[in-house]
Amino acid sequence: MDIISIVLLVLLVVLVVAFIFYAQNIKKNKQDAESLFNEAENKANEVMASAKREAESLKREAEAFKKEARYTLREEEQKQRREIEDEFKQERQELKETEKRLKQREEILDRKDDTLTKKEENLDSKEENLVRKTDTLSKREEQLAHIEEKKRLELERISNLSMDDAREIILSETRDGLTKEMAQTIRQSEEKAQAEADKRAKNIISLAIQRVSSDSVAEQTVSVVNLPDDGMKGRIIGREGRNIRTFEALTGIDVIIDDTPEAVVLSGFDPIRREIARMTLEQLVQDGRIHPARIEELVEKNRKALDHKMREYGEQAAFEVGAHNLHPDLMKIMGRLHFRTSYGQNVLDHSVEVAHIAGNLAGEMGENEALAKRSGFLHDIGKALDHEVEGSHVEIGTELARKYKENPIVINTIASHHGDTEPLSNIAVLVAAADALSAARPGARRESIENYIKRLKDLEAISTSFDGVETAFALQAGREIRVMVKPDKLTDDQIVILARDVKNRIEDEMDYPGNIKVTVIRETRAIDYAK
């Protein structure tokens, strides 16, 4: 074999090997392409599936958002509808109240129109009477002139009197006759005017009173506190009676525990003390912690709470009578009258009633109705402080009105409503009349309880008049007086002498049935705080 053949053979082998390698390479590339295609197809399927899931999720979220938006829109629509309905109801209620006020105003105007019509009719009647009387007098004058002429001629003929003498005689006789007739006419007119004035006054008072609706409730000197069970009575009494003794000493109120089921009675003449005791006992029963320290804490807390409540009572009463721009201190002082009685009549209710009656009287008389109501409302304000400040309630009330710069008419009304000072205005007279009407109406007052309360107050006043006495409480319906002294002012030996002195003063200055027990208490406390 020659070289060419060998070369050709080698070339052939190379070609065959290259072809085989090329074929394998093509096959491998095809497999790689198929693998890449399958992988791309799988990824595309995954992307499509993910996109489909995302689309379904977005669709569900859109549906949920749509439902939520529809629900929110429905809620908002219902809320707006309710607000509109409430606003409509409120406006309709306001419209009804306005119509009611207009109707009341119209009724007042109708009554005033009727009154004016009656006055006009009375004036017309009086005018007609005057015209008739004038005509009668004219005729009488003509008759007298004719008679006078006849007399003159007769006298001249008979007595040969001169003209001047005859004229004097005739005038004298005529004057006497006219004087008698005039006196009779004046007397009849005065009697008629007096009858008309009495009738008019009764009519005005009737109109003023019938427009005031008042309660006839007598004040009591006891309060009842309900208990959850009878076992609570023992806890109120405490070990060896220490709880009930502390309670009575701090409040000055008798605690009556008897066989009445599930109830305790608080007895005391001072309504403020009794209210503090009632509030304290109810809170103790509700809380369940009943011991001297807790009792002392609640008594002090309720004293402050009652001060706030008294201001609310004063503001409510002032709003009811229309007494605007009252000084806040005056409102608080007026609120104290809610817990003050006069012959069993609540003084704050009495003041409101006097304000309404005085306002109605002023309206009928053409006076300032608002000023009359304000004067009537404040006329007894001194009674709120008459047991704390020296002087009568009239003097105290006058000084308070001056202090807070009230209208001079209001000041004079307070000073004159019991006749101590001359009234300087019609309003002062009207308030005095309204005060008498309110006190005199049936069921308004009860004198026996007032005398009883005065005796208890006198007991306390005598006891607190001695040096070193801190406070005193009349208990057991006035059969016992407990005197609390300052331990740094009096010794144990001195309180024995004080008890005897109080007893002697009571015997000398008071009239009372039975015996009165005088108890003087001296208590020393040492307080410190562990830190």
UniProtKB/Swiss-Prot annotation:
Q: Which residues form the KH domain?
A: 221-281
The keyword Acyltransferase belongs to this UniProt entry's keyword annotation = no
Q: Where are the transmembrane segments?
A: 3-23
Q: Which domain of life is it from?
A: Bacteria
The record's EC number reads 3.1.-.-
Major location category of this protein: membrane
Pfam families in the record:
HD, KH_1, RNase_Y_N
Record's InterPro entries? HD/PDEase_dom, HD_domain, HDIG_dom, KH_dom, KH_dom_type_1, KH_dom_type_1_sf, Ribonuclease_Y, RNase_Y_N
Provide the Gene Ontology terms for cellular component. plasma membrane
Cite the SMART domains for this sequence. Answer: HDc, KH
| Gene Ontology process terms (BP) | mRNA catabolic process
The HD domain covers which part of the protein?
A: 347-440
Q: Does the keyword Isomerase apply?
A: no
- Enzyme class comes to hydrolase
Q: Name one GO molecular function term.
A: RNA endonuclease activity
Q: What subcellular locations does the record give?
A: Cell membrane
- Keyword annotations from UniProtKB, A to Z: Cell membrane, Endonuclease, Hydrolase, Membrane, Nuclease, RNA-binding, Transmembrane, Transmembrane helix
Q: Which NCBIfam families match?
A: HDIG, RNase_Y
Q: Which family is this sequence assigned to?
A: Belongs to the RNase Y family.
Q: What does this protein do?
A: Endoribonuclease that initiates mRNA decay.
In Swiss-Prot or TrEMBL terms, this protein is called Ribonuclease Y
Give the originating organism.
Answer: Lactococcus lactis subsp. cremoris (strain MG1363)
Task: Name the gene for this chain.
Answer: rny
